[in-house]
């Protein structure tokens, strides 16, 4: 487990715990805060990442109620009220222990899905390669908000499956680059570091790792993304699309080379 960076549990995490206790009751195995809050510290635009482990599948009505209640406490992207966005993942422990790839998630809440939620769509259970990385992060670096240490209820994710998850997630990530330049660039840097070193770090630390490995013409853009993530500059991407594409192509090729 990990120590909290700033010594304070984010308010949205506390509110999430209250909501899932109310909705799930005795079916909760554990609730864990992970991600930036416990690994490098929350940055200006960081989500609050919460993993909820339950012991059975969620009925449709429960997933609907969970979505509706999380929408009231999660900050919309770009809000000026200092309310952080939530990313809440729910898994049924029996679907991931014993381990199998790709892992199955029971539910996910994220602000990039708010438009779908507002239209009444509810996230269904699905197999998700990226969940392998989420579970590896949570098992290694998390704080229990409820229940035992995450390492006692989650099995270790094999590095081979983390590498498979990166390979399988790469196409969809790159397809979403327009309008999400910073996140895509930094996620690629983190993927590159992970497939090369086996470590999963924060996005800004991954960028610091990658910058010395880049050709000079790509360094500035990755550093802009890193500084924007840290709140050290107002990163603007208008007029830079061709350069962004070139950087993305370089990192994608580097990731694929490491995977092979």
Curated annotation (Swiss-Prot):
Keywords: Antibiotic resistance, ATP-binding, Nucleotide-binding, Nucleotidyltransferase, Transferase, Transposable element. GO terms for biological process: response to antibiotic. It holds the Pfam family AadA_C. InterPro entries: AadA/Aad9, AadA_C, NT_sf, Polymerase_NTP_transf_dom. SUPFAM superfamilies: Nucleotidyltransferase. GO terms for molecular function: adenylyltransferase activity; ATP binding. Gene3D superfamilies: Beta Polymerase, domain 2. It catalyses: spectinomycin + ATP = 9-O-adenylylspectinomycin + diphosphate. The keyword ATP-binding applies. Disulfide bonds: none annotated. The keyword Membrane does not apply. Mediates bacterial resistance to the antibiotic spectinomycin but not streptomycin. This is Spectinomycin 9-adenylyltransferase. It comes from Staphylococcus aureus.
């Amino acid at each position: 487990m990990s120590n909290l960076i700033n010594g304070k549990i984010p308010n949205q995490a506390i509110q999430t715990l209250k909501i899932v206790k109310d909705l799930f009751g005795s079916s909760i195995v554990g609730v864990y805060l992970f991600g930036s809050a416990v690994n490098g510290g929350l940055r200006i635009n960081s989500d609050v990442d919460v993993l909820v482990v339950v012991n059975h599948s969620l009925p449709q009505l429960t997933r609907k109620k969970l979505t509706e209640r999380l929408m009231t406490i999660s900050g919309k992207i770009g809000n000026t009220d200092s309310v952080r966005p939530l990313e809440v993942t729910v898994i049924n422990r029996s679907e991931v222990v014993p381990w199998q790839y790709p892992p199955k998630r029971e539910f996910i809440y994220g602000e990039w899905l708010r438009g779908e939620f507002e239209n009444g769509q509810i996230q269904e259970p699905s197999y998700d390669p990226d969940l392998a990385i989420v579970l590896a992060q949570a098992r290694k670096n998390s704080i229990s908000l409820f229940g035992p240490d995450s390492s006692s209820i989650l099995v270790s994710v094999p590095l081979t499956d983390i590498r498979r998850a990166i390979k399988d997630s790469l196409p969809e990530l790159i397809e979403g680059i327009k309008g999400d330049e910073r996140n895509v660039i930094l996620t690629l840097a983190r993927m590159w570091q992970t497939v090369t070193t086996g470590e999963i770090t924060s996005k800004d630390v991954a960028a610091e790792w990658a910058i010395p490995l880049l050709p000079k013409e790509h360094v500035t853009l990755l550093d802009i993304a890193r500084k924007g993530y840290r709140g050290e500059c107002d990163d603007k991407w208008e007029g830079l699309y061709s350069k962004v594409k070139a950087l993305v192509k370089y990192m994608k090729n580097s990731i694929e080379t490491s995977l092979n």
